[in-house]
Amino acid sequence: RDTDRSRGLGDVYKRQRIDRIDVSEDAEHVYVKVIDYKSGNKKFDLAALYYGLQLQLVVYMNAAMELESRKHPDKEIVPAALLYYHIDDPTIETPVELTDEQINEQILAKLRTNGVVNSDPEVVDRLDHYLQDKSAVIPVEKKKDGSFSARSGILSREEMQLVSAYVDAKIRDIGREILDGKIAANPYEKGNEEACTYCAYKKVCGFDGSIPGYEKRQLEDLDKQTLMQRMQETMEA
């Protein structure tokens, strides 16, 4: 389901078209899942989000939740999942013959969504009612004791709310900088990744690291706990 939303910030407006919104309802809640279709193998990166480099998916969720809250003012709107789906037609290569069921399982594994899911058991069950150990459709795995494995892409409801508020504040900061005329090239380096590698404007932006005074931002590779703590501190400042 597509939606088209505009949200204002003074004289700045964000206009976006969300690829897909799925909702599930009960008597008191509306659970919202947002999916962004990608031709490449996009991965959700909480650190990139913190640094303002990967805001789009959460912006979509914020818009979708606002839309649903207007439709259902008497219900609590719950973020269920923020997911990327890689549009692909995968092939399976194997040295041994597989059954049709085994082939389908491997294809599903290649097409599994990437992102973050609300860790609330009610939400996870609505997203994959047949989940036992490893989901074929969402980035969630369970250990033998029923807890989520470290490979799972999960956030608690409180963490999802914090991320939502942080991104909304980040967008407003970016909007103010645009209005203030701050448009200087400000590339970054994060581990082996750097902004200039695939930048479509690198031939015209004039940034040259060999010239004194031209330095890329050095971004730390932080763990989830530290990232959430820093987001919380930012929101409390």
Language model feature labels by segment:
Residues 2-13:
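Single conserved hydrophobic/aromatic residue that forms the stacking wall/gate
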Residues 14-26, 31-43, 60, 199:
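Conserved catalytic cores of phosphodiester-cleaving nucleases, focusing on short active-site segments
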Residues 41-46, 150:
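Short small-residue beta-strand/loop micro-motif enriched in glycine and branched aliphatics
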Residues 45-55:
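Short alpha-helix boundary/capping segments
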Residues 55-63:
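Short amphipathic alpha-helical face segments that pack within enzyme cores
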Residues 63-198, 213-215, 219-237:
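Metal-dependent nuclease catalytic regions and adjoining charged, substrate-binding loops involved
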Residues 202:
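Cys/His-rich metal-chelating microdomains
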Residues 205-208:
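Short, non-ligating residues that shape and space the ligands of small metal-coordination modules
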